[in-house]
Amino acid sequence: MRIDRLTSKLQLAISDAQSLAVGMDHPAIEPVHLLQALLEQQGGSIKPLLMQVGFDINGLRQGLVKELDQLPKIQNPTGDVNMSQDLARLLNQADRLAQQKGDQFISSELVLLAAMDENSKLGKLLLSQGVSKKALENAINNLRGGAAVNDANAEESRQALDKYTVDLTKRAEEGKLDPVIGRDDEIRRTVQVLQRRTKNNPVLIGEPGVGKTAIAEGLAQRIINGEVPDGLKGKRLLALDMGALIAGAKYRGEFEERLKSLLNELSKQEGQIILFIDELHTMVGAGKGEGAMDAGNMLKPALARGELHCVGATTLNEYRQFIEKDAALERRFQKVLVEEPSEEDTIAILRGLKERYEVHHKVAITDGAIIAAAKLSHRYITDRQLPDKAIDLIDEAASRIRMEIDSKPEVLDRLDRRLIQLKVESQALKKEEDEAAKKRLEKLTEEIERLEREYSDLEEIWASEKAEVQGSAQIQQKIEQSRQELEAARRKGDLNRMAELQYGVIPDLERSLQMVDQHGKTDNQLLRNKVTEEEIAEVVSKWTGIPVAKMLEGEREKLLKMEELLHQRVIGQSEAVTAVANAVRRSRAGLSDPNRPSGSFLFLGPTGVGKTELCKALAEFLFDTEEAMVRIDMSEFMEKHSVARLIGAPPGYVGYEEGGYLTEAVRRKPYSVVLLDEVEKAHPDVFNVLLQVLEDGRLTDSHGRTVDFRNTVIVMTSNLGSAQIQELVGDREAQRAAVMDAVGAHFRPEFINRIDEVVVFEPLGREQIAGITEIQLGRLRSRLLERELSLSLSPEALDKLIAVGYDPVYGARPLKRAIQRWIENPLAQLILAGKFLPGTAITAKVEGDEIVFG
């Protein structure tokens, strides 16, 4: 008989049977080998068919193993085996059955049917399972659905619905779907479209994360609960698994064949199945090769005739990009817009999901945490949508608490490491003989004993707290299971079981949970098992870098003493320091306008008075490093076209993909100090871009993404009016008026009006220069310390430096040059000459007109 008359699945099974025969040293391939191969075949139709008819698969496997063990074995096999006469006879019988059914190819199930007809050991084994041949034949007819086997791959296209879809209604019945809260209007609109006679295909369109897939799951739950019109009752909602449909389609036409078989099975169900296609845009162009038809075009006729009941889901951008281009496909769908829920709706959704997350993570989630998740995610995570981002916050915060429960608490871990360290040290000291070592060993032994007692006490507390937490989690899990059982009993109409669960089991479990909670009311020492607002705020801070967590005592003190800390770097300029400190305090106390930057300042004053230095000091205060500042030198933006560098080049221009210099920096660090240095040197068009930032705290880049500036402190520095400041030294009011005139002449009124505060820096006096000298020398000393050298200056040398470095016109910069010339240059020569070796204390004093070192 010709092998090419067998379906590809049967050919593979014969190949596996041959391998089995060779492996067991059998002389030929017997029908038993073939049935064993068919039974174990990946993705084969024989095992599901046998289970459907009522075969005991394990019993059949054992019988086959027994038969295989009884077959004769050969010594020194060559590895070459052929079909036995019994197997050839079986395949001929299957061939006759195929001809009777009008098949062009012999399929696996006909071999099984022929085996039951045989009066052989295999036939007896199959019939001993208590299943009649007639029952098997009926099951085969149902499997084939009246279709003939006219293709070698026909077996693979069978059971297409089981292979390429996921039954959402079944998952809803098993309680595996999360509850869907709200979204009634969207679900009602979806049902309304599904009830139409033709083009009854809704497509859910909305931003990523607004809950499009959840609406489909909500529809599945309503179908199961019978909360739908009669036209949808009893229907099944299947989600198409696009990955399974495409995966492994190696040859041309194989993908189309799979899709066609899926559509055929759907049409046979006569409208009893609704197909849910998530990421609908993937259907457009899927499987398209040279001369091939894509999935979207194959769906069109079925959609138009109403044979395919379909619910799609895709995002606005992808709908526009893929589906709107294909007008013929678009008109077959009816749009259902899914808007982002409000904060209140999100809170309701989170309350509905709370129990699922509590059971999964085995922790309690407080209502405060739910409200905080909705509010904080809405305010601080601007590039994602509710409710997805709020759910993620709850999930991650709960996961964090669970991780702490499962692993050793930090206190115990620290003690453990300390004990190991001390024990290693004591072992080393035991080898020493001198008195000092013995005394040290005694002290160490006492310390080890004390720490071991502390460790064992804490370990006991940890064990009891852990047991308490786990007990509560187990009861919660039982409550969740009982509620799922109650739903199943309600659907079946089992009133006895419903009464038992509703009035007996669930109230008892809830009472037990209350008792456990009452017992554990005292605050745990080591373990937290509740997700509160604080945990949510910590996760938001980790995601965005914005400090929204509750301030610790140390941070409050630091903020209250902010001016003092800034003055350690910035000498004088009290007005500017106070203005900046107030802006930061407003932001951290949560009192700043949520729709504007935390603070926007224009620093004016002559060169070298500390405008840029104050920004660096602020960045260091907030982030412990002055590198955390987004610094933009506005002198680089003197041309009109350079505006594009701030927000990104327009589409079609070089550099479009790179994004904007300012927008990208703030997207990466939404909580930062933005310094626009020498702002008056920029082209006037740059200020038009800044208007939006200063007023609304937002800026749209060239990609259409909105960048959030609400958590930034924006500082612009300028030298405008510095000549007037020098002329009017001592008269603050006249100085300010003159400077504001200069600013008004250069900037437009709408720009000046949007700045929170215009700060005029005073020229530096001799006293301030003395303070700055100490700071500059302190930096030099820290550099010398790396070489193990120290430096001290006599009062005369210090006065000399101040006298040389003081220039009211140029501020503190001449001082830096003076230190370089009088201190750093001669010191460098002396160090290189080898005069000062590591460990030397260098002193500088004045001799004549020079500063000398000794």
Curated annotation (Swiss-Prot):
* Start and end residues of each stretch annotated as C-terminal: 764-854
Q: What is its main location?
A: cytoplasm
One GO BP: cellular response to heat
**Stored CDD domains:** AAA (cd00009), RecA-like_ClpB_Hsp104-like (cd19499)
Name the domain of life.
Bacteria
Q: Name one Pfam family in it.
A: AAA
Q: Per the record's keyword annotation, is DNA damage included, yes or no?
A: no
Which portions of the sequence form the region NBD2?
A: 555-763
The record's region (Repeat 1) falls at 6-71
Q: Which Gene3D superfamilies match?
A: 1.10.8.60, Clp, N-terminal domain, P-loop containing nucleotide triphosphate hydrolases
Where is this protein localized, as stated in its record? Cytoplasm
Ranges in coiled-coil conformation = 391-524
Is tRNA processing included in the keywords of this UniProt record? Answer: no
Q: Which PANTHER family match?
A: ATP-DEPENDENT CLP PROTEASE, HEAT SHOCK PROTEIN 104
Q: What does this protein do?
A: Part of a stress-induced multi-chaperone system, it is involved in the recovery of the cell from heat-induced damage, in cooperation with DnaK, DnaJ and GrpE. Acts before DnaK, in the processing of protein aggregates. Protein binding stimulates the ATPase activity; ATP hydrolysis unfolds the denatured protein aggregates, which probably helps expose new hydrophobic binding sites on the surface of ClpB-bound aggregates, contributing to the solubilization and refolding of denatured protein aggregates by DnaK.
Which named protein is this?
Answer: Chaperone protein ClpB
